[in-house]
Every structure is written in C-alpha cells, then in structure tokens.
Amino acid sequence: PTSGKHRYHQPRTLNQAATQGGGTSIDLFSRQVVGWAMRDRADTELVVQAVLSAVWRRKPNAGCLVHSDQGSVYTSDDWRSFLASHGLVCSMSRRGNCHDNAPVESFFGLLKRERIRRRTYPTKDAARAEVFDYIEMFYNPNRRHGSTGDLSPVEFERRYAQRGS
C-alpha cells in the first residue's frame, strides 16, 4: 500500500560492525525498510541489491523516486542504468545537506544503538542474521516512529490500507 507520494530512500553505504557494507531502501511513507543488502564492500553492487530487493518486494510504479546522497556509487553509469531499467527516478541530496538523508541516518543510528554496538560476530553469516532479525522481526513490525503516529511501519501501512478499503 502506498499513498501515491511514495518514494524509496536510498542511503549512503555504511560499514557495519562485521566489516561488511550495508545498504537499505526505506519507504518514506511508512518508514519501513523495504529492501536491504550486505556485502564485503560498499560498492554499486551493494546499493543495486538493496534497491532490487525493494523492487521485488514492493513492485513500485514507474516514476518512483529513489533518493540518495551524492556518493560515487550513486553517480555511476551502472547505478543510473539500473534505475532507468526499472522505471525508477534518481533523486539526490544537495551537496553538504545531511538532512535530506535523515530517515536513513536515523535507521542506521538505531540499528547500531539497539542491536550491533559493542558486539562482535564470529562470521559474516552471523552478522547478516542479526541484521535480518533486527529489520524483519523487530524494526518493521514493532519499532514505533513519531512520523507515523507512534506506530510501527507494518501497523501504519495496515491501518492506511484499511482506510482505503
């Protein structure tokens, strides 16, 4: 369910505690993490995989905005070709304006504070499982947000869908 004012918010890449790159796609309407990926490197393939998982999950309409900062992975020809091939529109933060990426920065801050800070993982798979658990079992179904009336992303979307029926 979307409001029609729906866009995915693609963050800068971030090195996680397990020395992996992590990328997410967040639906700005509900604050739900709708796509994510982890790789050994923070590269174009990482952000493509994060958005591709959102495309598979949500099947957005053509013209859906994908917002990012101005990092090199988001200005590459591969990135732009990927977006165009899926009917997605690139939107970028203004240079030096961190506020455009606030929802994603907030998510990564919560992930670090609530789950991965001061933890070490014996394997990459263990780190990936921890991130999966946080996103799919806690953040999306249970983590409340002030921007959604203190509802979790899943509950916010459920209530929105009920209003439309």
Label every PLM stretch briefly.
Residues 1-165:
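Charged DNA-binding/catalytic regions of mobile-element recombinases
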